[in-house]
């Protein structure tokens, strides 16, 4: 299809976007894209309506599933089915993404870590499974108490770009149970060098010490690198 803003794409057009076309459509929207995340293991806000549908109804442009296990395919309050992601994409008509977590057993533990299920880990098998399920993008990140490190994220970006067909984003919104800085300019730029399509940066003030000048500087550099 011709280059078009994601904001202007119909559901039928979104369905046909390649990874490169999706990235271009996001860029063409000039910072106006809203990505909304939902924890699929929790009950929906309204019985009978998935949170993905709710987010789309309130104008989310991209949808991100957190705690989705590729082994069980469980989504709270959704009927059991073989292809829940295809079903949600049909209901919403939006690009659908997934959080996967690069656990680092050697990282400094700030707290006790949870035993993360295999279906939520950032592995080659799960990248391939995400392809089969039709996810449009991955976010390599860490939930609380999971033991995800910047070093593990960087290594996994390279792996994901080899085995996943969609876009790959990377970064941390909190420590994920490790003793390292949440926002590291060097690591965020290293993700881009490793092939990431974009990075996660906490909004100013949402994480202690995250400042406007710091975020602006990183954002400018990431954009210069194609993110």
Predicted regions and their residues:
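Glycine/small-residue-rich loop that forms an oxyanion/phosphate-binding "nest" at active or ligand-binding sites
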Residues: 105-106
């Amino acid at each position: 299809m011709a280059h078009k803003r994601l904001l202007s794409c119909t559901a039928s057009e979104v369905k046909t976007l390649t990874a490169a076309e999706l990235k271009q459509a996001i860029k063409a929207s000039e910072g106006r894209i809203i990505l909304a995340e939902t924890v699929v293991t929790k009950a929906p806000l309204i019985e009978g309506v998935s949170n993905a549908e709710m987010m789309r109804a309130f104008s989310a442009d991209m949808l991100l599933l957190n705690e989705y296990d590729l082994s069980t395919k469980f989504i709270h309050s959704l009927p059991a089915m073989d292809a829940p992601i295809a079903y949600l994409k049909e209901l919403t008509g939006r690009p659908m993404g997934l959080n996967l977590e690069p656990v680092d057993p050697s990282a400094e533990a700030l707290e006790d870590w949870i035993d993360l299920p295999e279906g939520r880990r950032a592995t080659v098998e799960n990248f391939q499974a995400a392809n089969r399920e039709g996810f449009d993008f991955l976010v390599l990140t860490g939930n609380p108490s999971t033991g995800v490190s910047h070093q593990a994220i960087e290594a996994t970006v390279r792996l994901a770009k080899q085995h996943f067909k969609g876009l790959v984003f990377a970064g941390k919104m909190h420590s994920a149970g490790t003793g390292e800085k949440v926002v590291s300019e060097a690591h965020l730029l290293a993700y881009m060098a490793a092939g990431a399509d974009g990075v996660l940066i906490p909004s100013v003030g949402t994480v202690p010490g995250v400042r406007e000048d710091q975020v602006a500087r990183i954002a400018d550099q990431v954009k210069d690198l194609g993110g």
